[in-house]
């Protein structure tokens, strides 16, 4: 038998759409790794179904979307797709350059937090940690759950 | 048995191939503990059908790129695929950036390919502690082929032998002193040797060096093909799949033996872990005295270890005792 222990939080750091700015997402991936998390990092230009498949297979606790020059409103569409795929428990944060008007739309769609340029490492780590722990606590334990 | 949530619904869902259940089961296996053990027991009868293929080799040889192309080839042959890509954890933070998947982008829309990134979590040998269980989950989920990419080869990577029926050692020209990069132990576990990046000028030299090394092998050892690939252009990959399939049909009897070795190793690892935990937490006065004597050099460490282990084990016979042996022990 394997030793029972705690599993590090698993976080998907990715970018959807045509936005190629990847400096922020690389830095954030390194922050989270150095804080002891397992980061699944992807290059930019992912699709919504692609992100859903990734998040499902990798069983992540949090998804971090970096969004600098896209139609930011792609994020609410992703949230909807996640819920439809049974991943409603996964926490979502966004970072990058998001106009204030759109920030409220993201919040309304269930995004926990939007980070802007210059966001501090400690703040990011603290937020993602809390969100990941909440996500684990809230997840319906699939292994006792009835067949849907 | 400790009261734990029944793993049976999860076992059923994963056997039906539900990706969310498969993903959750893998996490559970990584966590370990009684729920994992119960789930493993529940799915074990459904395992043993998948073809397991391991890719190992030095960092940057092109393993992930080759796996990506190889999986595409497997899909062309109509097989469903599970991929387990192992990356190292940082020894300092315990965290990891799991990057193999970056090179496996072409399968993002294909439900026939399930990819899972695993962190080594300090386990030596290029794999992770729970790798056997993870592979069993994908096997029970009905994946026809399971592809395992290990952490770039060190010297201790022979563990892949237990896990994969067919082992592919990937090399590339120009990775330092070519042949030095391929340690002898690694050569011995190879079912197939690949020289990837065959588009690079030094490739023929690497092929020659590998063939020369192979010629030094003992007589009677199975032939190891040396193939050239250009993973980034899908070249040589169909030939690689053909070689893999040939290798798998050549030695079908290996599967049962490998499985037994594997289970034996899992039992040994579990026992070692349990013993370690017990001894680290042991504060019995007689044991503390044994430690003190060892510290003074009055007894050697091996003797102290054996004494501790035997005292801990308490001479309790195994639950399923073979009658004759039990008699002998009693008398
Ligand atoms: C560098 C840069 C580029 C580089 C990108 C290089 C690269 N590989 O990343 C290049 C020159 C290629 C480029 C191109 C373009 N750019 Co540009 N670019 C910038 C610039 C100057 C800096 C971005 C940057 O790298 N910052 C450094 C990183 C570390 O900061 P960051 O990404 O903000 O990340 C921090 C936080 O936001 C947060 N964070 C970010 N992501 C995440 C994710 C998670 C999960 C979390 C928790 C936190 C988090 O944490 C980070 C650390 O604090 C910005 C202007 C600016 N001041 O931001 C414009 C900017 C982003 N670019 C812009 C534009 C318009 C473009 C182009 C469309 C220009 C054009 N017409 O061609 C192209 C598009 C290219 C493409 N395909 O996407 C606009 C976007 C406007 C908008 N939001 O609507 C900006 C804002 C400039 C402007 N004021 O107009 N750009
Ligand atoms: N020229 C050439 N480059 C290749 C080929 N295959 C892979 N590469 C490149 O080699 C680099 C490493 O490829 P990976 O697939 O990440 O190698 P890896 O062995 O998985 O690396 P690690 O997982 O980090 O050990 C990448 O830049 C690839 O694009 C090839 O056939 N020819
Ligand atoms: Mg790799």
Swiss-Prot record, chain A:
Its EC number is 5.4.99.-. It is an enzyme of class 5 (isomerase). The keyword Metal-binding applies. Coiled coil: none annotated. The keyword Transmembrane does not apply. It catalyses: 3-methylbutanoyl-CoA = 2,2-dimethylpropanoyl-CoA. It comes from the Bacteria. This enzyme and the derivative PCM-F, a variant in which the alpha and beta subunits are fused into a single polypeptide via a short 11-amino acid linker, have potential applications in bioremediation of pivalic acid found in sludge, in stereospecific synthesis of C5 carboxylic acids and alcohols, and in the production of potential commodity and specialty chemicals. Its cofactor is adenosylcob(III)alamin. Adenosylcob(III)alamin binds at residue 21. One of its GO terms (molecular function) is metal ion binding. Keywords: Cobalamin, Cobalt, Isomerase, Metal-binding, Plasmid. NCBIfam families: acid_CoA_mut_C. Belongs to the acyl-CoA mutase small subunit family. Monomer in the absence of the PCM large subunit. Weakly interacts with the PCM large subunit; an alpha(2)beta(2) stoichiometry seems to represent the active state of the enzyme. This is Pivalyl-CoA mutase small subunit. It comes from Xanthobacter autotrophicus (strain ATCC BAA-1158 / Py2).
């Amino acid at each position: 038998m394997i030793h029972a222990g705690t599993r590090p939080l698993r976080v998907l750091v990715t970018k959807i759409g045509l936005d190629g700015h990847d400096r922020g997402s690389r830095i954030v991936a390194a922050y989270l790794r150095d804080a002891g998390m397992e980061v699944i990092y992807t290059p930019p230009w992912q699709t919504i179904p692609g992100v859903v498949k990734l998040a499902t297979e990798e069983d992540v606790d949090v998804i971090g979307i970096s969004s600098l020059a896209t139609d930011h409103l792609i994020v609410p569409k992703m949230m909807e797709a996640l819920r439809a795929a049974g991943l409603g428990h996964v926490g979502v944060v966004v970072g990058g350059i998001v106009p204030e008007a759109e920030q409220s739309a993201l919040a309304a769609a269930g995004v926990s937090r939007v980070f802007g340029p210059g966001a501090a490492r400690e703040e990011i780590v603290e937020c993602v940690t809390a969100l990941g722990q909440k996500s684990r606590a809230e997840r319906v334990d699939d292994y006792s759950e009835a067949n849907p | 048995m400790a009261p734990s949530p029944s793993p049976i619904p999860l076992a059923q869902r994963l056997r039906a191939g539900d990706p969310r259940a498969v993903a959750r089961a893998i996490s559970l296996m990584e966590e370990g503990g009684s729920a994992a053990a119960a789930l493993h027991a529940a799915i074990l009868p459904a395992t043993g059908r998948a073809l397991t293929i391991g890719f190992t080799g030095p960092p940057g040889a092109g393993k992930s790129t080759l796996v990506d192309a190889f999986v595409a080839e497997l899909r062309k042959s109509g097989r469903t695929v599970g991929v387990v890509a192992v990356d190292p954890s940082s020894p300092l933070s315990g965290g990891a950036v799991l990057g193999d998947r970056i090179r496996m982008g072409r399968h993002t829309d294909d439900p026939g390919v399930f990819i899972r990134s695993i962190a080594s979590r300090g386990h030596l040998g290029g794999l992770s502690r729970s790798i056997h269980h993870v592979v069993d989950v994908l096997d029970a989920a009905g994946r026809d082929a399971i592809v395992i990419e290990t952490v770039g080869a060190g010297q201790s990577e022979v563990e892949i032998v237990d896990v994969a029926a067919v082992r592919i050692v990937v090399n590339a020209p120009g990775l330092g002193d070519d042949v030095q990069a391929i340690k002898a132990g690694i050569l011995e576990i190879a079912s197939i040797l690949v020289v990837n990046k065959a588009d690079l000028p030094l490739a023929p030299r690497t092929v020659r060096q590998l063939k020369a090394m192979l010629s030094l092998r003992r007589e009677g050892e199975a032939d190891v093909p040396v193939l050239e690939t250009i993973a980034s252009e899908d070249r040589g990959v169909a030939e690689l799949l053909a070689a893999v399939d040939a290798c798998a049909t050549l030695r079908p009897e290996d599967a049962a033996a490998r499985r037994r070795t594997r289970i034996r190793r899992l039992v040994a690892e579990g026992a070692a872990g349990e013993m370690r935990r017990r001894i680290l937490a042991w504060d019995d006065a007689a044991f503390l005295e044994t430690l003190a004597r060892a510290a003074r050099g009055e007894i050697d460490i091996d003797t102290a270890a054996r004494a501790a282990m035997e005292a801990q084990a308490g001479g309790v016979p195994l639950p399923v005792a073979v009658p004759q042996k039990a008699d002998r022990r009693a008398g």
